[in-house]
Amino acid sequence: MFKKLFLPVGILIAVIWSLAAPAAGLFCKEYIGTPAMIVAIFLVSGMQVKFNELKFDRKFVLALIFGSGFTLVGLSFCGWLTLNWMNWDKALLAGLLVMLAAPPTLSSGIVMTNQSNGNMMLSIAITVFYNLIAIVTLPLVLGFLLNAAAAGNVDSWKMFKQLILTVMLPLFIGYGIKKYIMKSFYHKLIDYIPLTATIMLSLAFFAAARESILAIPIVTVLVVLFAALIFHIFSMAALWFISKVLRMSVADTKAMVFCGASKSATMALAMVAIAGLGSSAAAVPCLLFYALQLFLDAVLANYARRF
């Protein structure tokens, strides 16, 4: 229970702390740096990934193709088409688009699948491969959408190179370290490093964007939460429909829905930094979306255990 609550409670404390006293967050941003925190997150995430447990079959390949196509590309364009005509603050629009384009979380999606009695192995496969595919889709999708929405001047090639250096390489290096060096003495406390780094990222982003965030009306926050709710439910419904078309089992469907529809706040915050939006309010929709997702998925996962 402590580990499950560590990230959401930690992010909540970080947000309140950074808005009340931004000095700690500004210190993290200035002297530790967001790239170092991102590398730490994915270095340890690589140690947690279990590539050897993945199983390939026809349904997995089809789920990978159609599921990733929707959640990594289609959902983002749906969000852009829906929100672009509204008079949104550009930073908030950018943050929501980043979250919609993000791959699944590296942990909570699997936890929710397991909680719902879904196919945990398929959820692991979806998590690993969606995150790898996202290395390619994120710079392409966000490079187009953020520029088209005038929400940021994004260089797709630069973004791709930074994703390789700060996400993909640390992920595989971490996997190699766990497999060949720390195989017998990996301590579970190491699992808290990416969680702590994500909290520090939140602290840094909210401290840097404090003035912009405090200027956001409460009504706008509620609108962002409502938009996040609509898009998350839409994503889960679409993935449920895809799984039915592919005639997947109930357990596989649960993995598709709970894992495929989950969005990684860690990756979203990393993308906010890489896209040069770290000093704006772009992190706000990411964290609001993440908090709403955690609550809604926990409720639905417990309900889904009946089926």
Label for each model-derived stretch:
Residues M1-F307:
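Alpha-helical transmembrane segments of multi-pass small-molecule/ion transporters
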